């Protein structure tokens, strides 16, 4: 029963955030710069974290996000559980991102991010995407979402994966 509810509720969450993000992306118009950032293990060191409001940031990645926000619109994409929305929003504001200065998009899986990236890429926007697209951090052997990475690389966007920004996670 729990799996059925999660599947039904998760589909609603995905549909809501994808629809809302698509409207905001399309309202930007062509030739605008748009920057997508994952949160977990991209701008925040969530490995082993028990409380998301206490998660340590990667300061140089936070600086990069703030720099990119001067150039265009910032969207945070996350595959966190929707129940963490308030604590995630609180964490972002605490790190210096004012409410209204960014969009926060929750999705049930990393693969769902492709729909949003595709919308931006096919509407003439200048898109840059930062995401480690990895999992299993807590078990010591990091694994990549290879299929998702390949799909992202097939889009007309600039993708920055873990190997591109690991040096900023000091």
Where are these regions (language model features)?
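C-terminal cap/substrate-recognition subdomain and adjoining C-terminal extension
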Residues: 85-170
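Metal-dependent phosphoesterase signature
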Residues: 27, 31-59
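Structural beta-sheet core signal
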Residues: 76-78, 129
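Short acidic, S/G/P-rich loop/turn micro-motifs used as interaction or catalytic elements
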Residues: 42-45, 49-50, 81-83, 134-137
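Anion (oxyanion) recognition and catalysis
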Residues: 29, 66-70, 121, 153
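Short, acidic loop-to-helix structural element flanking the phosphoryl-transfer center
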Residues: 49-75, 85-89, 110, 115-118
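Non-catalytic pre-domain segments flanking phosphatase-related domains
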Residues: 1-37
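Short coil/turn segments at beta-strand junctions that form active-site/ligand-binding loops
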Residues: 31-33, 72-73, 123-127
